[in-house]
Amino acid sequence: MSRAAVPAMLDSGGGSLVHVGSDSGRLPEVGNQDYAAAKLALLALSKSLATEFSPLAIRSNVVVPGPTRTPLYDRPGGFGDQAAELWGIDKESAITRMVTQIRPLLTHKMGQPDDIAQVIAYLVSPLSRQVTAAEWTVDGGALRQV
């Protein structure tokens, strides 16, 4: 996607690339190695693009969501139902357990898609004109990294 966008941005005088990663790139889980590796590589790609193209007025940043309440959790047979079945509890209790015990979030609640969308809206706006080569973590405090 970036490969296609950069020439158009160069022709129009600049722009903002926003990549959507995952905290799985920094906090890999069992059985998720390919996904984690791809998301970590996306961080390096975005920073490389920022290094090359920021002098040409193209910024590049990554939004790094944590657990987010999407249809992957809510659809029949989704993550919520799978966890509920595994633990023998209802779906909402299973999701609460996920974010308080299994993969603790400081907020004790999953993010919503709008939480990520608001950060992306900022990063593509003129308000972020000096923001490039950055990671914006939106994970309810899951990573707690310094």
Where are these regions (language model features)?
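Alpha-helical segment proximal to the catalytic Tyr-Lys
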Residues: 7, 51-52, 129
